Amino acid sequence: MTLYHISIKKIIKHYTFSILVTSLLLSSAAFSGCSLKNATGTTDTKSQEPISATAIKLNTAVTVTIYDSQNRELLTECMNLCDKYEKIFSRTASDSELYKLNHRGLTPVSGTKDTFQVSDSLAELIKKGLSYSELSEGAFDIAIEPLTSLWDFTAENPQVPEDKLIQEALSKCDYRNVSVNDNNEVTLKTDDTAIELGAIAKGYIADRLKDYLVSQNVKSAIINLGGNVLCIGGKPDDSSFKIGIQKPFADRSETIAVMDIKDKSVVSSGVYERCFEQDGTLYHHLLNPKTGYPYDNGLIAVTIISDQSVDGDALSTTCFSLGLENGMKLAESLDDVQAFFVTSDYEIHYTKDFQKEITVTETD
């Protein structure tokens, strides 16, 4: 078995970004002797090598690997879809739909000053974000954009903001100031309300890529959006993909666990994804919308296995925000969701049925 690490490391002084989930895949030699069905449904004994494409999209490394087709146009369309959705969900691109909504650059609905018509995709994702904000009672808050912008973990030299500025930003963060109706009309109830979808957008986009590939008869593929891994089926021989979870703060080649995954999403959130150190203290990007500072609850990572990647994306952040006990309770209350939590002592805590449903090997 050959180990392929789908990873990127970007260091801008104190800022480190890393992809958490690596894929352990069989080498091409392991496919010899088997015939594969390509995306047109015909058998192709020569096309046994997977096809893959990687590009920097959505401010991260996007990799799509297809195992049962040689049609590279499928890969091109996946990258085009990433571009399409980035123009909808980006918080920072001035031509994106979300940016225009946050900066009141859209025309208000007739007779209103704070309600705006948005696209189906943006309305759908805002609704999803609001549902998790409500489920977590604000521990996950899609109206956290003023606080996210203030901390700006993507800056060349990120710094801890002044407390008075943090408190000012906090006063603007409340998901209850956002509503969306069935006509795709979004209401921002205060002038300072702004939406941040970074915690769920990649999951949503991964699901849309899967929808597209499945519509093209692809039955074996891995979609990796910066560590949001979504498996379509399993390997061409019908065995499971092996997905490795990176050990927090370790070398990119070091995993803490390896799981057998088929037709599921695997998403992780951790304190080491985007962080910087100041005066001997590590500050990470998972901000508490109640205090304005990074969460400090004894967790360093949460991994969610789910059917839909958007749910895994939202839940990995939500469960982290809730802490080990309450995050575990939430994960165990949901159908078709499994999770494991890594505490600061590197102990792994599984939801009750995790190891019954998913084969996992701890590697540390």
Regions found by a protein language model. Name each.
Residues 2-19, 23-364:
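Mature catalytic core of soluble alpha/beta enzymes
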